[in-house]
Amino acid sequence: MNKQLKEKLALLPDQPGCYLMKDRQKTVIYVGKAKVLKNRVRSYFTGSHDAKTQRLVSEIEDFEYIVTSSNLEALILEMNLIKKYDPKYNVMLKDDKTYPFIKITHERHPRLIVTRNVKKDKGRYFGPYPNVQAARETKKLLDRLYPLRKCSKLPDRVCLYYHLGQCLAPCVKDISEETNREIVEDITRFLKGGHNEIKKELEAKMAEAAEKLEFERAKEFRDQLAHIESTMEKQKMTMNDLLDRDVFAYAYDKGWMCVQVFFIRQGKLIERDVSMFPMYQEADEEFLTFIGQFYSKNNHFLPKEILVPDSVDRDMITELLETAVHQPKKGPKKELLLLAHKNAKIALREKFSLIERDEERSIGAAERLGEALNIYTPHRIEAFDNSNIQGTNPVSAMIVFIDGKPNKKEYRKYKIKTVTGPDDYGSMREVVRRRYTRVLRENLPLPDLIIIDGGKGQINAARDVLENELGLDVPVAGLAKDDKHRTSNLLIGDPLEPVFLERNSQEFYLLQRIQDEVHRFAISFHRQIRGKSVFQSVLDDIPGIGEKRKKMLLKHFGSVKKMKEASLDDIKKAGVPAAAAQLLFEKLKK
């Protein structure tokens, strides 16, 4: 901890507020709130913490704080600061998690539409629905039952919907406001859970039509009833009061929190939302931050009622959201809370199981690979592969695996500079020399294991440069392949000896992933270089096309094939003078 941090920690007040943690570049990396700033901020720098909190603390170089007059004010300020700074260690809910609604537009002749955007435009919104298909099915049913206008702009003649009986044709007929209002009220009644009443009305109309021997009309009513049954059957009833509500519950363990949200609309459980994130505050405070962001950042529909666990501050949530907040003690609402909590615990348990499985696949594999090679665990592995075709455009590539996982930010590509022709040994010497000269010069981390995707000659070439030129003692292993060019085993030691691994072991799979990845990376780089080389050769010796114009053409057309397909005018439009364009066009057509 630096001196400035110690001095600022000593001056923290015994008041509520927000704190902003900053890194070396003065970037805000975490925003938190506290009932007592002094206690909360100091806690980061004292005692033991789990790995993720240690990682956060290790990056803190400075902090600032803002005192507030209440805990609620601190919560609101925290939400605003998170929006402003977008800190990398804060929970940021995704913007794209929006649900579809059915909307009755506020127009002279209203329309029924499916939308994801809830606006304050006097339209009536119903939902959300679990997915757009559910919303469209319900709208399709309503279109059959209620003939509202369908066209966004009124045409000058009737459309197909009029002939299907699904539109009153306000484009050519004088439809009264009273008629529109009655239809809107019927749709509203249906969407608010009154479909059973509407079913009874349709059954009565069907019976009346049958008595009058109007069998076609009776069949229409029967079909409408069947559509209501099939559409509404898909939506399970959970509450009898038909109220819109969101049910929140959370579980936490090992420094992680899972929040489950059940969406209840018109008494139906239509969908749930699952969020999983690391904790840096007390559980109840993490939850308050989450629920504040949930409605503000995602623009979620705010229902009439929210159910939350007993462990959180109900009054603060009520003030924050301005809706009814309840903490039920028994009955169906309590059962919903318990069900959401049970799901949160299950989701956490599954996450930890996946983490353990992933660690077994990555860290565990690296540990056992070290045991098989009789070296320390190779937390950092660097692998090399050469690529050329008969010595042309020779390149090499290096990839990095850390704790059994690829770290693509540290991948490197090399154009071979000192070797001509197909000389894999010389190429390997050059690349290893360039890589580890730079590592030593810039004090970069050394690998625990170097893997060469090549035979004994390349392994010995790499080891010779490391030991005799650079004075480095890093284990070097080679990937031996079978006759189908698949990973067979490892070569290591002096002299080189094969190390056999079980083909179904995680350490063997790790080697396969490394070999496939370094080969892919090298090949893709070689293709890129070769493509540029072919492109350049086509453009050689054409007056008026120098290096600058070659690059421009490469960028414009992308490949020789596309340039050959181009017309003379296309080449001119790419910025080539007429005379040079004519020469190039003729050369391409030969």
UniProtKB/Swiss-Prot annotation:
<dbReference type="Pfam" id="PF22920">
    <property type="entry name" value="UvrC_RNaseH"/>
</dbReference>
<comment type="function">
    <text>The UvrABC repair system catalyzes the recognition and processing of DNA lesions. UvrC both incises the 5' and 3' sides of the lesion. The N-terminal half is responsible for the 3' incision and the C-terminal half is responsible for the 5' incision.</text>
</comment>
<protein>
    <recommendedName>
        <fullName>UvrABC system protein C</fullName>
    </recommendedName>
</protein>
<dbReference type="InterPro" id="IPR000305">
    <property type="entry name" value="GIY-YIG_endonuc"/>
</dbReference>
<dbReference type="GO" id="GO:0009380">
    <property type="term" value="C:excinuclease repair complex"/>
</dbReference>
<dbReference type="Pfam" id="PF08459">
    <property type="entry name" value="UvrC_RNaseH_dom"/>
</dbReference>
<dbReference type="InterPro" id="IPR036876">
    <property type="entry name" value="UVR_dom_sf"/>
</dbReference>
<dbReference type="GO" id="GO:0005737">
    <property type="term" value="C:cytoplasm"/>
</dbReference>
<dbReference type="InterPro" id="IPR047296">
    <property type="entry name" value="GIY-YIG_UvrC_Cho"/>
</dbReference>
<dbReference type="InterPro" id="IPR001943">
    <property type="entry name" value="UVR_dom"/>
</dbReference>
<feature type="domain" description="UVR">
    <location>
        <begin position="196"/>
        <end position="231"/>
    </location>
</feature>
<dbReference type="Pfam" id="PF02151">
    <property type="entry name" value="UVR"/>
</dbReference>
<dbReference type="GO" id="GO:0009381">
    <property type="term" value="F:excinuclease ABC activity"/>
</dbReference>
<keyword id="KW-0742">SOS response</keyword>
<dbReference type="Pfam" id="PF14520">
    <property type="entry name" value="HHH_5"/>
</dbReference>
<keyword id="KW-0227">DNA damage</keyword>
<dbReference type="InterPro" id="IPR001162">
    <property type="entry name" value="UvrC_RNase_H_dom"/>
</dbReference>
<feature type="domain" description="GIY-YIG">
    <location>
        <begin position="14"/>
        <end position="91"/>
    </location>
</feature>
<dbReference type="InterPro" id="IPR050066">
    <property type="entry name" value="UvrABC_protein_C"/>
</dbReference>
<keyword id="KW-0234">DNA repair</keyword>
<dbReference type="GO" id="GO:0006289">
    <property type="term" value="P:nucleotide-excision repair"/>
</dbReference>
<dbReference type="GO" id="GO:0009432">
    <property type="term" value="P:SOS response"/>
</dbReference>
<keyword id="KW-0228">DNA excision</keyword>
<keyword id="KW-0267">Excision nuclease</keyword>
<dbReference type="GO" id="GO:0003677">
    <property type="term" value="F:DNA binding"/>
</dbReference>
<keyword id="KW-0963">Cytoplasm</keyword>
<comment type="subunit">
    <text>Interacts with UvrB in an incision complex.</text>
</comment>
<dbReference type="InterPro" id="IPR038476">
    <property type="entry name" value="UvrC_RNase_H_dom_sf"/>
</dbReference>
<dbReference type="InterPro" id="IPR010994">
    <property type="entry name" value="RuvA_2-like"/>
</dbReference>
<dbReference type="InterPro" id="IPR035901">
    <property type="entry name" value="GIY-YIG_endonuc_sf"/>
</dbReference>
<comment type="similarity">
    <text>Belongs to the UvrC family.</text>
</comment>
<dbReference type="InterPro" id="IPR004791">
    <property type="entry name" value="UvrC"/>
</dbReference>
<dbReference type="Pfam" id="PF01541">
    <property type="entry name" value="GIY-YIG"/>
</dbReference>
